[in-house]
């Protein structure tokens, strides 16, 4: 390394101040105003069934630093530093020793699917033409909303901008937030059943040859976006409330989504990961939902795929856990979302004292749900060759590295990825030998795209 990375000094103890939303004003309206005012901002929220996870929503605006990563390069506020590994270089930028057990700011952004080469140096993956491999904003202040109590909290780490927030709150008292507008048009449709079938058959040949046990193959649809992508997110959050909902806008890059899948969470030393694989559609009523769920739980292909993922998650968590602490807390639950039902399990473990949130996330990246097994073989020699187009942020990680050493990341699926006026949606399905009907796999991809497609359809121009 020819240049020394800057060290960002952050106080150990953050400040928290209670604010008040005027009666009748929602936290969402506050974000509308912030998004219109600040070029770089984020909203992280949840509509999950876990009370702890869904209780808090977080807003950040105008980060103190903007960090981009590509192989061999870490870019900080436009200045490029040659580094051995841009991902692990994040660890060097500050100390992550905040004394708060609550959220106190940190790095918010995404790792693209191609970031796998940061953890597996032998991989040579094609870069996405429109999205950097990694981009994060460092947010040292922001807003936390407690949905249970209605309390609005402003936190900061020495750079207090509470006066700016109060100005926005006063503005909301006087006038309603302006609803964002956007129109979209389809530029490139997804693949036909025939082309997808050829891809599935090609993947099956790799499975038969023993090159992989399971492989995730899919495709994308490309759209032109005119207007504000926040309008699309507003629609998506209404039609597909999910455990992980996010709107992250950094420079020209915007990721918006409603993902059912947690990638990795570290909270006060406990790691959690959630295998989510096995998919069926929603029924027209509760009775059909139950019948479809029962069929899902007795489907040999879906059971085989999910069992493989449980093993992958146990192995991933076990790489950085204290010996003997890894266990499957829940197994084969069925989670229901707006358009699909999934089989879900939970794997937990206690982080080793030699590890941290960066090595913890790295051990789980990317999730086998989006790659297959073994990961290197599936990623480098099969998926990229068969799919042809690089995945970009899809299937990577979106979330936050906290200044207190905790982190939460979701898998960016059921998402829309925008750069300038170009956006895409993508989905994939698992290929397991002996259990594949190409037409079913094609329909699974269509089902997975359904919520984002519906949101986009509601914004199509004349």
Swiss-Prot record:
Keywords: Amino-acid biosynthesis, Aromatic amino acid biosynthesis, Lyase, Magnesium, Metal-binding, Tryptophan biosynthesis. Binds 1 Mg(2+) ion per subunit. Mg(2+) binds at residues 305, 444. Disulfide bonds: none annotated. It catalyses: chorismate + L-glutamine = anthranilate + pyruvate + L-glutamate + H(+). Chorismate binds at residues 278-279, 394, 414, 428-430. Feedback inhibited by tryptophan. The keyword Metal-binding applies. L-tryptophan binds at residues 46, 243-245. One of its GO terms (molecular function) is metal ion binding. Its cofactor is Mg(2+). Belongs to the anthranilate synthase component I family. Part of a heterotetrameric complex that catalyzes the two-step biosynthesis of anthranilate, an intermediate in the biosynthesis of L-tryptophan. In the first step, the glutamine-binding beta subunit (TrpG) of anthranilate synthase (AS) provides the glutamine amidotransferase activity which generates ammonia as a substrate that, along with chorismate, is used in the second step, catalyzed by the large alpha subunit of AS (TrpE) to produce anthranilate. In the absence of TrpG, TrpE can synthesize anthranilate directly from chorismate and high concentrations of ammonia. This is Anthranilate synthase component 1.
């Amino acid at each position: 390394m020819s240049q020394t990375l800057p060290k960002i000094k952050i106080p150990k103890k953050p400040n928290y101040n209670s604010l008040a939303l005027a009666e009748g004003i929602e936290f969402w309206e506050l974000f509308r105003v912030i998004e219109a005012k600040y070029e770089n901002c984020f909203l992280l929220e949840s509509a999950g069934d876990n009370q702890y996870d869904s209780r808090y929503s977080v807003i950040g605006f105008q980060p103190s630093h903007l960090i981009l990563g590509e192989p061999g390069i870490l870019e900080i506020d436009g200045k490029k530093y040659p580094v051995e590994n841009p991902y692990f270089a994040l660890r060097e930028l500050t100390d992550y020793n905040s004394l708060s057990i609550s959220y106190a700011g940190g790095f918010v952004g995404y790792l693209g699917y191609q970031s796998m080469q940061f953890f597996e140096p032998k991989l040579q993956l094609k870069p996405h033409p429109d999205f950097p491999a990694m981009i994060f904003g460092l947010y040292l202040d922001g807003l936390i909303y407690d949905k249970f109590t209605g309390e609005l909290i402003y936190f900061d780490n020495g750079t207090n901008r509470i006066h700016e927030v109060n100005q926005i709150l006063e503005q909301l008292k006087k006038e309603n937030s302006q609803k964002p507008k956007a129109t979209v048009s389809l530029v490139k449709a997804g693949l036909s059943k025939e082309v997808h079938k050829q891809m599935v058959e090609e993947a099956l040949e790799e499975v038969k040859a023993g090159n992989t046990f399971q492989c995730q193959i899919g495709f994308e649809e490309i759209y032109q976006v005119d207007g504000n992508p926040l309008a699309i997110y507003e629609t998506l959050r209404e039609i597909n409330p999910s455990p992980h909902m996010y709107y992250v806008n950094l420079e020209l890059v915007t990721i918006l989504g409603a993902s059912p899948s947690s990638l990795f969470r570290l909270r006060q030393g406990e790691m959690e990961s959630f295998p989510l694989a096995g998919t069926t559609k929603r029924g027209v009523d509760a009775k059909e939902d139950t019948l479809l769920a029962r069929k899902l739980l007795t489907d040999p292909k879906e059971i085989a795929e999910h069992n493989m993922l449980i093993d992958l998650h146990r192995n991933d968590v076990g790489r950085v856990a204290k010996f003997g602490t890894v266990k499957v807390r829940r197994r084969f639950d069925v989670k229901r979302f707006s358009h699909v039902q999934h089989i879900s399990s939970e794997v937990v473990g206690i982080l080793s004292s030699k590890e941290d949130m960066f090595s913890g996330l790295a051990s789980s990246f990317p999730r086998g749900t989006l790659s297959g097994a073994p990961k290197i073989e599936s990623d480098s020699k099969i998926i990229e060759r068969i799919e042809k187009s690089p995945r970009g942020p899809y299937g990577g990680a979106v979330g936050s590295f906290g200044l207190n050493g905790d982190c939460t990341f979701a898998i960016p699926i059921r998402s829309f990825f925008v750069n300038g006026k170009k956006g895409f949606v993508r989905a994939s399905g698992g290929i397991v030998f002996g259990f594949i009907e190409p037409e079913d796999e094609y329909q699974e991809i269509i089902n997975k795209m359904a919520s984002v497609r519906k949101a986009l359809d509601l914004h199509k121009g004349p």
